[in-house]
């Protein structure tokens, strides 16, 4: 594989591991020319459904967009990159399991929200506020109240 830093053709695999969700192989590589290290991922290429946007246009499913959206919602939150990858893999699996050739963007957004709900409640609220286009504080309060009803009460944090 070509080095992303110096473009040299000769790189060696230093370490290989199966990802946490088992859907990819993570490889650490070292360039023999510049001695820099980098990570690559090997995963199965799947035929995921096309995404039908709200305006009716269609686009290919783009894993990177889902990862970027989740990373934005999870910005400065204590969630590992592997957990994000595992969540995206679960979304892809759910889409494949439907057997459909197309998925509405609204459905895809709901799948992302469900995964974020399990990863980090703050990220869930952030994503929901943009995805559902919250217009005032009461909508935030409604989502927070949903969490309070769904989870057992915790004692307040000491500051």
UniProtKB/Swiss-Prot annotation:
A GO molecular function held by the record: zinc ion binding
Cofactor: Zn(2+)
Name by which UniProt lists this protein: Transcriptional repressor NrdR
Zinc fingers typed unnamed, residue spans: 3-34
Recorded family membership: Belongs to the NrdR family.
InterPro entries: ATP-cone_dom (IPR005144), NrdR-like_N (IPR055173), RNR_NrdR-like (IPR003796)
Keywords: ATP-binding, DNA-binding, Metal-binding, Nucleotide-binding, Repressor, Transcription, Transcription regulation, Zinc, Zinc-finger
PANTHER family: TRANSCRIPTIONAL REPRESSOR NRDR
Top-level lineage group: Bacteria
Organism: Burkholderia vietnamiensis (strain G4 / LMG 22486) (Burkholderia cepacia (strain R1808))
GO terms classed as biological process: negative regulation of DNA-templated transcription
Note describing how the cofactor binds: Binds 1 zinc ion.
Boundaries of every ATP-cone domain copy: 49-139
Function: Negatively regulates transcription of bacterial ribonucleotide reductase nrd genes and operons by binding to NrdR-boxes.
